[in-house]
C-alpha cells in the first residue's frame, strides 16, 4: 500500500523567519515586476494582523484624523496624536516596512521643524516617513534622505491641500496637469524618494508615471 510519512517536525527545528522589508528591498520588488502590498493601521491589533498576513508596507496615515478620531479631514490631527498611533503600530509590526505620515503643519513652516519631526518619528519606531507635495518638496525630501531616513512622496489628490484643490477631486485630467504631475514624480524620484503615492489620478496617468519611474 501507499506509505504514509509520519515524521514529525522536532520542537527544536528552527522556523523560517520572514525577511524584513526595507525601502531598498521594495525597489527590488518593483524591478522583478512583483506586486507590493500595503495597508494603513492605527492600532496594535490591526498592525499585528497586517504583519502576520505578510503585508509589505504598513502606513500610519494621517487619515487617523477622519477615520478614527472623528475629524472632518486630515488637517486637524496633531503630531502627538500621530505618535500615539505610531507607537501602537510599532508594537505589532516586525516584518513590514513601517511608514509614518507627516501631519499638516509638521513640515510646512521650515526645514528645522520638519527634520525635528522626522527624528522624533524615527525614535518612536518609524522606518520611513511620507509627506505630500510635488516639486516644491524635492529639496526637503533630499535633506531628509541625506539624513538617513527613507521618504515616500505623495502627489495627485493630496488631502492636506483639500481646500486649495476645491475638494476631493480627481487630479491630472488635463494634458497640462498630467504633464505637471509627471514632472513632480520625476523630481521626487531624483530627490531620493523610495516610493510615491499616486492618489486620485486617471489610471492611464498612473500607469505612465509608474513606467517612467524606477521606484
Predicted regions and their residues:
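Alpha/beta enzyme core
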Residues: 1-215
Amino acid at each position: 500500500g501507499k506509505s504514509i510519512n509520519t515524521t514529525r517536525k522536532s520542537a527544536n527545528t528552527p522556523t523560517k523567519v520572514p525577511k524584513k522589508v526595507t525601502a531598498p528591498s521594495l525597489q527590488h520588488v518593483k524591478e522583478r515586476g512583483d506586486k507590493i502590498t500595503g495597508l494603513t493601521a492605527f492600532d496594535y491589533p490591526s498592525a499585528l494582523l497586517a504583519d502576520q498576513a505578510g503585508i509589505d508596507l504598513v502606513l500610519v496615515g494621517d487619515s487617523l484624523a477622519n477615520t478614527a478620531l472623528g475629524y472632518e479631514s486630515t488637517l486637524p490631527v496633531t503630531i502627538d496624536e500621530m505618535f500615539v498611533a505610531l507607537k501602537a503600530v510599532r508594537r505589532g509590526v516586525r516584518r513590514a516596512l513601517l511608514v509614518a505620515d507627516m501631519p499638516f503643519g509638521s513640515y510646512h513652516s521650515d526645514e528645522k521643524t520638519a527634520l525635528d519631526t522626522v527624528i522624533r518619528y524615527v525614535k518612536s519606531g518609524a522606518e520611513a516617513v511620507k509627506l505630500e507635495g510635488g516639486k516644491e518638496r524635492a529639496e526637503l525630501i533630499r535633506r531628509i534622505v541625506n539624513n538617513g531616513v527613507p521618504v515616500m512622496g505623495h502627489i495627485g489628490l493630496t488631502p492636506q491641500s483639500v481646500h486649495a484643490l476645491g475638494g476631493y477631486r480627481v487630479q491630472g485630467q488635463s494634458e497640462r496637469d498630467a504633464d505637471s504631475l509627471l514632472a513632480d514624480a520625476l523630481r521626487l524620484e531624483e530627490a531620493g524618494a523610495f516610493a510615491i503615492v499616486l492618489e486620485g489620478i486617471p489610471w492611464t496617468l498612473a500607469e505612465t508615471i509608474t513606467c517612467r519611474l524606477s521606484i
